[in-house]
């Protein structure tokens, strides 16, 4: 039952992650198209070729540096007797600023993906873990996560079992038994509460193993895709 539950959550999270990436790609492409649409074109007043404002200035400088007759400005329609290029750059310089401003806000699809990285992975894990689990009070879990650089980079906090086990009351030891030394804990039991029964400790080990396998699969899926 637990494995089916995790698999269903993983599938839902992968669908959510793919949908968000697709939305980011579309958003980036729309912004690029918008930049192309709002870029106006003007006809050269001498040869009537269409250019945007930057290529028009380059065209006037190369093809029409000295024109003997007056011509209307392609932007404001004023009669310009000479030096059309100087008139456009001085009187209509705002067009260059607007074009640079539009380019500053264009986000290609590849850059849009990089902007998603942290927020999208956090949302991915929130969906996967059902809104995120509460942090365990056991300090050994925090130590294990911080020891692994991959896990610490994602900031994972594993959910514990649905029903928290209440700690058992301390057992009072009579005075005459105070000389009895405590048995040292086994190395494999150091990260598990000693007040738990053998069956409970075994169950916690199995849960930790399932979670570790799940996190490994999740990281591989996120990094390398399907």
UniProtKB/Swiss-Prot annotation:
Residues 158-208 are annotated as: Disordered. Residues 196-205 have a biased composition (Basic and acidic residues). Belongs to the Di19 family. This is Protein DEHYDRATION-INDUCED 19. It comes from Oryza sativa subsp. japonica (Rice).
